[in-house]
A protein has these predicted regions:
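Catalytic cores of DNA base-excision repair glycosylases
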Residues: 3-210
Length: 210
């Protein structure tokens, strides 16, 4: 418990007002940006989404988009063929079945092309303020380094353990803080361990401080 309190205090110190770094204006734009961010970076996603939503300003436009044209725009984020098809599929369902509004129901959202549990957690937490902890690569890495989860735990295992340890009213905020902490401090390569007050709890402190 002491470790968790120290982590929460440190995250509040580093990121008192954490913000999602994906650029969006509408609900479906956020959902699509999160889908595009899989196995990519927010920076790359932010380089293509303004182009997408400028060229295709409505869901109907995206639904009718030429797939090859959309693929070329999305190419920088990786897996561009698959992701272009996901975006067209999402636009089509939202336009045809939901009057252009992204549903808040988790099961319905997870039935959309390219939308899994992590994407739903990010979307619901960011857009609607629904308590959720989305476990992306940063959250998973930091959690395992700080022994909040076992090294062989699945993403779902990590999520469930964090939900038990973190107060529910902090879940969405905690997710954003952990993403930023993993992105800028507890990095996959060359983490900034020297001055980290959490290193006493870290599995990798010896390796990264030697």
């Amino acid at each position: 418990m002491m470790m968790m309190n120290k982590l929460l205090d440190y995250l509040d110190y580093l990121f008192p007002n954490p913000k999602c770094e994906l650029i969006y204006q509408k609900d479906y734009q956020l959902l699509m940006a999160v889908v595009l961010s899989a196995q990519s970076t927010d920076k790359r996603v932010n380089s293509v989404t303004p182009i997408i939503f400028s060229k295709y300003p409505t869901l109907e436009d995206l639904k009718k988009a030429n797939l090859s044209d959309l693929e070329e725009i999305i190419r920088p984020v990786g897996s561009f063929r698959k992701k272009a098809a996901f975006l067209k599929g999402i636009a089509t369902r939202l336009f045809d079945e939901f009057n252009g509004v992204v549903p808040i129901d988790r099961e319905v959202l997870e039935s959309f092309p390219g939308v899994g549990r992590k994407t739903v957690n990010v979307f619901l937490g960011e857009f609607y303020g629904v308590p959720a902890i989305a476990v992306d690569t940063h959250v998973e890495r930091v959690s395992k380094r700080l022994k909040l989860a076992y090294l062989n735990d699945s993403v779902l295992d990590v999520e469930r353990k964090l939900m038990k340890k973190v107060p529910k009213d902090r879940w969405a905020r905690f997710h954003l803080q952990m993403v930023l902490f993993g992105r800028y401090y507890c990095k996959a390569v060359k983490p900034l361990c020297k001055d980290c007050p959490l290193k006493e709890f870290c599995r990798e402190k010896k390796k990264n401080l030697d």
